[in-house]
Amino acid sequence: MSTPPVYITAPARERAPAIVVLPPIFGLEPAILQLADRYAQRGFLTLAVNQFWREPETRVMGRDAVERPRALERAGKVDVERIIDDVGIVIDRARAHEGCDGRVAVLGICFGGRYAFMSAARHRIGAAGAFHGTQIGLELDEGPRVACPLSFHFGALDIQTPPDEIAAIRRVTAHRADAEIVVHDGADHNFAVPGHPAYNPDVAARAERAVLALFSAMPAYR
């Protein structure tokens, strides 16, 4: 069986919790690999997924005026069900990795946020997180099936995820007292992406601390 390509980076300790990172529409761009390396330095086995490996163009795309429209077009044509199935394959791969202690979380960034939310409802994970996740509102029917803690972080200035969508996410996850949905004042889309003009180091640090604390405390899936 073919499996999605992943970028794997491991911490110094022998066994650790794993994070499956689901990137933005541009793919495994340098900023995402930088984040993956940082999570490994903080004690997590990290697997960053190329969600576009089935598409005609699998490569990393740029954020410039030429490449961005192509990235948006590619993202608009994906098969959502195939991607979420692929995420499940990577979750199983992470759990079976010799460096994993049996605990696996999913972290979605931008485009990846939708699949982090779906993973919380469909896959065997201990927790899910997201930084300025998009299109989660398309999957609200998954909300009542969310079966793990959440730590999802949005920017108050981010027009890609308006207040009514965030309110709906809160509503459909209200059955879980451990569903943390946070809106950060003064933060815009891409607040967590190093090197982006909207990168907000203070907000990014707060959001990252919350997510990694959740992932550190998560139990193994049973």
List the predicted regions and their residue ranges.
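N-terminal cap/leader regions of alpha/beta-hydrolase-fold enzymes
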Residues: 1-222
